[in-house]
Structures are given as C-alpha cells and as structure tokens.
C-alpha cells in the first residue's frame, strides 16, 4: 500500500501541471487586433525612418513625400522591413513576458526532426510547382510590385536579404508563433477534439496572413492562404516554429530567384 501511494505520488510529480492559457478569448481578439495594428504601424514607421535616412532632401521634406517616394524605393523598403522586424519581434517577446509566459516554449523555438523537415520541404515543392503551373496558365505576374523596388535599390543583396530572410522571420514569429499559440491554447480543454485548436488557429492565422499582403490581387492572395496553411501544418507536424521559418525562406528565395532570372 505504501509503495502504491509512493508510485501515485511520483506519477503526480512526473506529469507537468496543465499550463493556463496566457490569454483569455477576449485577450486573443485584442492581441490579434493589436498585433495587426503594430504590423502596419511598424511598416509605416520603418518607411519613415528609412526614408529620412536614405531619400534625397527633395523627396523627404514632408511626411506625404516620404511615404510616396519611400514605399517605391527599394533601399527604403528593405531597411523598413528590417526596422519592422526588430520592432515586431521585440513587441511579441514583450507581450509573452508580460503575460508571464516563456517565449522559447510559447513560440516553439526548438529543433525539429530531419525526416519531418524533408517531408515538409517535399510538400512545399509540390505546392510551388503547382502554383507555378497555374500562374503560367492564367498568365499572372505576381511579383510586379517588386519592379520599382528592384530598379531603385542601392544593392540587390539588400532587397534579397530583407525579403528572403528578414520578412519570413518576423511573419512566422507573429502568425505561426504568437497568434497561433494564443488561439490553440483556447481549445485545450477535454471537451474539444484533439486537433480542434490547431485547425482553428491554422485557418484564422492563414486568412489574416493573406489579408495583410495588400500588394497582391485575389489570385495571389488565395495562393498565399494555401502557402500559410502549409506553414501551419509544418508547425503542427514538427512542433517547432523553426521549420515554418525555414520553409518560408525557401519559398521567398525561390520566388526571388525566379524574379531575378526573368529580369536579368
């Protein structure tokens, strides 16, 4: 009997206590609205700061000038992406810290299995080939907005670094990191089916992720929803945010490489 008691006690020690969600339902709604506002404000702030630094005096005398010329200037946009990244990553970490969470745990910043990584890379390649074929058949050119940026950037490497490496890092941190976790943890009670949280989080964050890409048309936005769902699936399968970040970098890298190959 003593041994049984001990065994049950040790069992209590080994199962970690269930973590209370960092955010209430209302909290998740406010977090989503707040993060989206922060997303747009940080972009504007980034363009303003970079515009002040980079644009010639004739183009940066008024705020309207800075936004008008800056948003079509490759160097300004590249720098604004980097400024935005720093601001948004800092805000995300701060929000988690304020709510008493562990950022590494909450954002799933941990290694993933190579097998899952290779499998997801395969899935991404299938998607990329399919969307490429569809883009060709429908005669779309989704990267038209890059033209003025490419033509005006001081170094094409700056544009590549900002769009291929930096943008995926903070976009994943927000959409498949902070918002995804905040939504998933609303569905941890036993009354919900096992995958309910992941499905809801994936659909909601993917739609929001697509909507923020205002520079695209409806066809491109629908492919972005599918792409975002693939990134969500990678987060679920690997239990890590690092895999979606890597896949996002591969995707943006392939798109940029193709754009440069066509432009050259």
What are these model-predicted stretches?
Residues 3-23:
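Short, Lys/Arg-rich, polar N-terminal cytosolic tail immediately upstream
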Residues 84-88, 159, 223-231:
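Hydrophobic core segments of transmembrane alpha-helices in multi-pass, intramembrane catalytic enzymes
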Residues 64-87, 154-159, 192-205, 240-243:
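Membrane-interface starts of transmembrane alpha-helices
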Residues 38-48, 199-214, 218-264:
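Functionally important transmembrane alpha-helices
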Residues 170-204, 233-240:
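Membrane-interface helix/loop boundary segments of multi-pass membrane proteins
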Residues 32-96:
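Alpha-helical transmembrane segments in multi-pass membrane proteins
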Residues 54-78, 98-167, 185-188, 259-260, ...:
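Juxtamembrane helix-loop-helix connectors linking adjacent transmembrane helices
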Residues 19-36, 110-121:
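Alpha-helical transmembrane segments and their helix-start/interface "positive-inside/aromatic belt" motifs
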